[in-house]
A protein has these predicted regions:
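Aromatic-lined, polymer-binding surfaces characteristic
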Residues: 108
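Histidine-centered, transition-metal-coordinating active-site segments
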Residues: 1-101, 111-294
Length: 294
């Protein structure tokens, strides 16, 4: 039986041959099939969408992008898989195809984000899709869909199901918990990365290596858990998230600017082609709003 560790991206995790570097001194392996996804126009678009939007008005160095974060989550997903591949229960439950679907989902999890996505979604206006559903327009047809079929031997629907549908069985519950759960690849990356770029220590005060090293399956076998040795690291992760929301994401000046943006979008959205608007990079998005305002 083929080991999960034989997956090309996991084999290349410690390689020096083909990689890209992102802050802070993180080496991200780029296999040919990963590079084919990254080089699509849909994924490159994320390089022109900031990760934190209006937070940069308060923390001026917070100009990192969804592109950088997506690479970071992809790398974190590989670290999760490498740790869990040594768990016999995990390897019995998760096939190679499942693991590769998880790798792709981690890389593409933010594909449907548009500029200032979360504040605009929060208004709940008719005609504004969730970013998960908007991602389907990129994932189910076009170059990314072709690459998934031809290079990864995956059906695009498998990826969208993992990203946006309710898990149907324990296998999907495990994978979903690795991507969106109390301790997940997304959270471990964005807390550290956002903290680093904002110039604050709050999101980096937990032992990431210890936490990953303690990952295992829970008792029922339908999600992630941590061994006792990772308990303190997990508690520090929870506190790090709390402080990042208190001091960064929900900073009073950020919330004020967010309310102004929401008000402007509420007043102008009827004059805009939302599908076209949401496909634009951040600068063009702001220009479109400004022109609509006259």
């Amino acid at each position: 039986m083929t080991s999960l560790l034989d997956i090309p991206e996991l084999r290349e995790l410690d390689s020096r041959k083909s990689l890209v570097r992102i802050p802070h001194e993180e080496d991200v392996p780029l296999t040919p099939r990963v590079r084919m996804l990254i080089d699509t126009a849909e994924f490159r678009r994320l390089a022109r969408i900031s990760q934190l939007g209006l937070v940069s008005l308060v923390y001026p160095a917070a100009n990192h992008t969804r592109f950088e974060h997506s690479l970071g989550v992809y790398r974190m997903a590989l670290l999760f898989l490498r740790q869990l591949a040594g768990d016999p229960r995990f390897e019995a439950a998760i096939t190679r195809e499942d693991a590769e679907c998880f790798i792709v989902a981690a890389l593409l999890h933010d594909l449907g984000h548009w500029p200032f996505c979360h504040p605009i979604e929060d208004i709940r206006l008719p005609g504004v899709p969730s970013h998960e559903l908007f991602a389907n327009s990129f994932l189910l047809e076009g170059e990314i869909a072709d690459t998934l079929r031809d290079e990864w031997n995956l059906q695009p629907r498998e990826v969208t199901a993992l990203l946006s549908e309710k898990p149907r069985d324990n296998r999907q519950r495990i994978l979903r918990s690795m991507l969106s759960g109390p301790v997940d690849a997304d959270k471990l990356d964005y807390l550290h990365r956002d903290s680093l770029h904002c110039g604050v220590p709050y999101g980096r005060h937990f032992d990431q290596q210890r936490l990953i090293g303690s990952l295992c399956l829970n008792g029922p076998g339908d999600g992630l858990a941590i061994r006792d040795k990772g308990r303190t690291a997990a508690e520090m992760l929870v506190f790090a998230r709390y402080v990042m929301f208190s001091e960064v994401y929900w900073h009073h000046a950020v919330r004020s600017a967010t309310a102004m943006l929401q008000r402007a979008f509420f007043l102008l959205h009827g004059q805009l082609d939302l599908d076209q608007l949401f496909r634009q990079p951040e600068h063009a998005f702001i220009t479109s709003l400004t022109q609509a305002a006259g």
